[in-house]
Amino acid sequence: IFLNSSLFIFAVGLLVLRLIKYLIRLIYRIGKKRWSPAVYASFLQITRTVKKQGFISVFLVMTIAMGMFNSNMARTINDNKTKRINYNLGTDLVVQEQWTRGTYIDKKKKTHWYYTEGDFERYTKLEGSVCDKVTRVIYDDDAVIKAGGEELAGSVLMGINTKEFGETARLQSGLNKEHWYNYLNDLAEVSNGVIISSNLAKKYNIKVGDSINYARYSPMKGKEKEEIASPSGTVCAIVDAFPGFQQYVYQKNSDGEMEEVERYLVVANYAYVVSAFSQTPYQVWMRLADGKSYKDALRAIDAEDINIVQYDSLDKDIKEMQESPLVLITNGLFSLSFIIAIILCMVGFLIYWITSIKQRELMFGIYRAMGMSMHEINKMLINEQIFSSVLASLAGYGVGVAATILFVKLVAVVYLPEAHNIAISIAVDPYDLIKLTAVVIFMFIVCFIVIRTILKKMNITQALKLGED
């Protein structure tokens, strides 16, 4: 894919340069009778040396186009990874407290279990200090959904308080047909209501208003899994995406190979889930206050003597992603390739123009002998730069845009091969374009300064005498 994108940039660069040549000829003919001697001479030089300038012009196009392509590629990979991490977690911080489980035996010698819930106010006390909002979320990724006469094991069940959850969780806009708050409002109106994922609805042709059953297994380990209960739920809404729900996960099969597993979602009211399955351990989702980090929240939790057995932090996950070897190598590779291309382009640019000016020293003397001032000679060189180097640079931006549209998503698939609720989207930051433009302008300024210095040191006086002769 990288080779194809490079060949595409090279081929389109050649095509664009051919079009630029015809554009220059058109401009030359339009003002042929009105150009000043300096401008006229510059157009003659451009049209006569178009083949010689072709190499450096192609280099300019490829350098700028590859710089833009690599920049957009790195931005797309980083942004899409960040979006997926944000979606997978659903909020800033998710903590799991250690719960105490007890058992007892009834008169029929049947074993029962129960959990002792800690005081949730220990978390709500953190609101206004390190957190803006906290909420309880029952999350079970080993639930069973019963629909269409079949059972879907390994499904995801979430029990939420709709108002608190809406204030705590986050979801990228545009993933559902309407704002996800509307789905929460629909769920809040029906005590036994459920929100289901669109893949479940499509699989069994379920519509809003239909009923499904879902079940959870007992936490007591035995030879066979035992269902706690199998309540019925009325479908209130169907969603394509929901905070914290990963539709696709990757697990090892019996052969030890990773395989894609599609999961299904049921979201129910927290109180209804507790009444149906008894009190079970839940996650605490936290939206951090501005300026507060997950470490601040963990310290505050520790100060409340809360025993946390597991936590997931958005900032921590994003930082680990940014510091992962794959991302670091990719970003470093793109940056290094652009720096090398800029250096080679600058060196080639200088070599070409220094050689060209040295070869035209006698010609400059003739122009001076004909009455052309140094100011007009400088004007002639500037015009040559505009219609050769600057136009090629602008063409590079156009080619870079085309390459970004056609190839960035394809290359991003290599770095983000997993199926996900969030499709890969091209990310372009105007600031990256500004930085690229600044580097290119700096390169041109350095080259112009060097060329100007060489031009001043040229022995124009001797060339002038030769021109007069």
Language model: regions and residue ranges:
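Short helix-loop junctions at transmembrane helix boundaries
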Residues: 1-2, 327-330, 379, 394-462
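Alpha-helical transmembrane segments, especially those used as permease/efflux helices
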Residues: 1-73, 391-394, 435-448
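Alpha-helical transmembrane segments
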Residues: 2, 19-21, 54, 65-91, ...
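Peri-transmembrane interface segments
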Residues: 2-7, 296-345, 356-359, 380
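Transmembrane helix boundary and interhelical loop/hinge segments in multi-pass membrane proteins
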Residues: 23, 38-39, 356-365, 457
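Short beta-strand boundary microenvironments
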Residues: 83-92, 98-218, 228-241, 253-257, ...
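"Rare, low-scoring activations can occur
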Residues: 236-240, 264-325
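Interfacial "coupling" helices/loops that link adjacent transmembrane helices in transporter permeases
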Residues: 347-389
